[in-house]
């Protein structure tokens, strides 16, 4: 429904300097006027995009809050509808009270993502741009933010439009033969179509190849630190974070629960997980932590396996190495600053079995730069894409690109095998429609609802 007026709190719930209640729809001004008072009663006639000082009153005439009201006339708004944003003090009570007044005076509580959905349905944003809004909100590094802003700016949409335009050119050439079957396609024309089709396939596949990097920028890499108790796992976490987040003691088994933190490693977000030491234990609480650690290893994209240069290798170390299986693993020999090392370089290389081994001192911070380099190399082959490179970060977009490439490949193969041109045209249309799913020109209403349901209320 686009003919009603919606309202929601648009800022995170909690205590803060400012909180915003957003109202959008044909009656946004009418709703706000019922509980917002300022010296000028016809404030909505003073022009759009203005900030107005006043007070919010409840039905009994009591002041709820001292506020600044932003008034924006359609169509120059986020939703392309009339929008009123009430900037309150950022406490839970005043925000909820203002929202209650908006709902009591004719607005409906917005569904998750409904403001962005209206922006899409009203032509303010295409679907790819609308999805980038949530990516901007959730971005964890500058690289992730850069990818999301590029998408909001329309870089992906323009690329899709370009690919679709060239596909339509191919389709026009093929369909001309359907309309005039007596005019066989000349050999030169066939070669042009094949060459153009293959160029399009390679271009789309290159975008798909970069999508894995985009997914990493968007979602991060789940990285788990494991090892037996007291080898320096928590010290490593603190060293990477550059702060004391985890408890560090000489008592084995100090970490009994999972500690999760996001860190930025050269533009790559790592969800880094410090686990309980993996060992057999009679302590019921510690045993729960050990089981959680095992689950974290199973779900991890990257494992940092910590060994202790001061104490050497034990049966527990070998048992842990077996548990990581075929995971991406970096072996880290900690406490490399001790004089008498009980692990040799040859011994560490032997148990790593060809996997990377790094020597560090989490206490002194030595070796961390090389560790960061190795993480980037393991995760992205050492490649951090240039700022002007188009990268897609959304799995839905990648799958649509893959379908488009597959349909195009079918069309090219069909031309080579002299398949009837109407069948080739079907594949070309399917490729065009697959690309249209990215920007929303060829999606179903059900899919649109599912996409925006993932947004937060107020956005």
Swiss-Prot record:
Its main location: cytoplasm. K(+) binds at residues 230, 249, 251, 254. CDD domains: trmE, TrmE_N. The keyword Glycosyltransferase does not apply. It comes from the Bacteria. GO terms for molecular function: ATP hydrolysis activity; GTP binding; GTPase activity; metal ion binding. Its EC number is 3.6.-.-. The keyword Hydrolase applies. Keywords: Cytoplasm, GTP-binding, Hydrolase, Magnesium, Metal-binding, Nucleotide-binding, Potassium, tRNA processing. Coiled coil: none annotated. Residues 220-380 form the TrmE-type G domain. SUPFAM superfamilies: P-loop containing nucleoside triphosphate hydrolases. One of its GO terms (cellular component) is cytosol. Mg(2+) binds at residues 234, 255. GO terms for biological process: tRNA methylation; tRNA wobble uridine modification. (6S)-5-formyl-5,6,7,8-tetrahydrofolate binds at residues 22, 85, 124, 459. Belongs to the TRAFAC class TrmE-Era-EngA-EngB-Septin-like GTPase superfamily. TrmE GTPase family. This is tRNA modification GTPase MnmE. It comes from Pelotomaculum thermopropionicum (strain DSM 13744 / JCM 10971 / SI).
């Amino acid at each position: 429904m686009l003919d009603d007026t919606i309202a929601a709190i648009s800022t995170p719930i909690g205590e803060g300097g400012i909180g915003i209640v957003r109202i959008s729809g044909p009656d946004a001004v009418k709703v706000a006027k019922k509980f917002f008072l300022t010296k000028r009663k016809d404030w909505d006639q003073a022009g759009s995009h203005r900030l107005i000082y006043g007070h919010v009153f409840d039905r009994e005439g009591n002041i709820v809050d001292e506020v600044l009201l932003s008034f924006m006339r359609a169509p120059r708004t986020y939703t392309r509808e009339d929008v009123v944003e009430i900037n309150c003090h950022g406490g839970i009570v005043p925000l909820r009270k203002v929202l209650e007044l908006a709902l009591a005076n004719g607005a409906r509580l917005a569904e998750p993502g409904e403001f962005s959905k209206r922006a899409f349905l009203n032509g303010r944003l295409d679907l790819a741009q609308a999805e980038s809004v949530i990516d901007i909100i959730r971005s964890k590094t500058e690289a992730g933010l850069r990818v999301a802003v590029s998408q909001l700016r329309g870089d992906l949409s323009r690329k899709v439009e370009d690919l679709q335009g060239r596909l339509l050119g191919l389709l026009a050439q093929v369909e001309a033969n359907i309309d005039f079957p007596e005019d066989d396609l000349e050999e030169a024309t066939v070669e042009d179509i094949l060459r153009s089709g293959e160029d399009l396939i390679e271009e789309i596949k290159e975008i798909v190849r970069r999508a894995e990097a985009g997914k990493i920028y968007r979602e991060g890499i789940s990285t788990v630190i494991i090892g037996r108790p007291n080898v320096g796992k928590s010290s490593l976490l603190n060293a990477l974070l550059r702060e004391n987040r985890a408890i560090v003691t000489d008592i084995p088994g100090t970490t009994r629960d999972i500690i999760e933190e996001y860190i930025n490693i050269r533009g790559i977000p790592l969800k880094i997980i410090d686990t309980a030491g993996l060992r057999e234990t009679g302590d019921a609480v510690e045993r729960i932590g050990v089981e959680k650690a095992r689950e974290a290893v199973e779900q991890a994209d990257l494992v940092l396996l910590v060994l202790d240069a001061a104490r050497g290798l034990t049966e527990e170390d070998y048992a842990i190495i077996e548990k990581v299986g075929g995971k991406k693993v970096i072996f880290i020999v900690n406490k490399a600053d001790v004089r008498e090392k009980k692990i040799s370089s040859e011994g560490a290389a032997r148990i790593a079995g060809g996997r990377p081994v790094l020597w560090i001192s989490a206490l002194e911070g030595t070796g961390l730069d090389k560790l960061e380099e190795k993480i980037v190399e393991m995760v992205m082959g050492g490649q951090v894409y240039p700022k002007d490179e188009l990268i897609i970060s959304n799995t839905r977009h990648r799958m649509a690109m893959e379908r488009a490439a597959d349909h195009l490949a079918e069309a090219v193969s069909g031309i080579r095998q002299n398949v009837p041109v109407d069948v080739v045209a079907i594949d070309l249309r399917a490729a065009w429609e697959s690309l249209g799913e990215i920007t929303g020109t060829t999606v179903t209403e059900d899919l649109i609802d599912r996409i925006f349901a993932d947004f937060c209320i107020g956005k």
